[in-house]
Amino acid sequence: MNKQLLTLFPTPIITVEIPKELSVACNYLDSIPQKDNGSSATYGTYSENTYVMNAPECKELGDFILKCVGDYGRNILGYDYDEYAFSQTWVSWKQPGQMHHNHTHPNSLISAVFFYGEREENTPAITFTKQFAVANCSYIQPLMVKDRKDIPTAWSSFSINYNPGLLIIFPSYLSH
């Protein structure tokens, strides 16, 4: 029997290691004021400034990230744009057990997460989730096998562990 798996419309995510010389921007990121939205026990804190990549201290890092985003847009997603710009950039600080709520970024095409700082035990990963309530999805939810680790096409979530210096680039519609 001759069979072929066709993985139609995959969702590409790329990871890039930031060059060590760009990590000097992390000193600035650590120095900016934090804000608490009232649920810091579960959510953590975030920067008061939601345009941190506009700071002169972040110029080289921001330029590197935008170059990576441009390469991803053109060569992975097939987008036809001459340049990209940040819509917003902020820092989110999490302790073990804290996490973002699941969300997308509807005001942009491409999103990125940059991990920096020290790795601690139980530092939360970023988890991407498959959206079931979308077009072309059966209203009948199937009974899934319990162990799907060897069946990537059946995964409903995928996590990337915290790794300082790692940049993760993905389509903004991807829930995370």
Put a short name on every predicted segment.
Residues 8, 83, 104-108:
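A generic structural micro-feature
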Residues 10-12, 87, 108-110:
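Residues at beta-strand starts and edge strands
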Residues 92-169:
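Catalytic core of non-heme Fe(II) oxygenases with the double-stranded beta-helix
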